[in-house]
Amino acid sequence: MYLFFLIFLIFISFSLIFLILLQSGKGFNNTIHLNTSNNFNFFNSVGSGGFIKNIIGFFAGFFLIFSIILCNINDKKVNSDVFLEKNTQKKTINEKKEQKILNSELPL
């Protein structure tokens, strides 16, 4: 299950990067994007970037949700391992105490 969420998160992150880079530039440095407006007419014809912004919003939401899920799964794995380590340490300490008590008896 952890592997599924991890692969899906990687897919969402690459999709977000691709969609963000696909947007047409409207800022200060438009000289880089000379002919990109003609290449991506599908995204520009729907509206003033509304379609691609909605897709990016959905992918960003999925990214947030899946990263929280992965953090919770990873946290549960770490906490369960910590509890197992503490229990084994307690058992070894108790066994050592019992051995000391058994070995401390002197025959009369």
UniProtKB/Swiss-Prot annotation:
Involved in protein export. Participates in an early event of protein translocation. Part of the prokaryotic protein translocation apparatus which comprise SecA, SecB, SecE, SecF, SecG and SecY. It comes from the Bacteria. The chain crosses the membrane at residues 2-22, 51-71. This is Protein-export membrane protein SecG. Keywords: Cell membrane, Membrane, Protein transport, Translocation, Transmembrane, Transmembrane helix, Transport. It is a multi-pass membrane protein. Its main location: membrane.
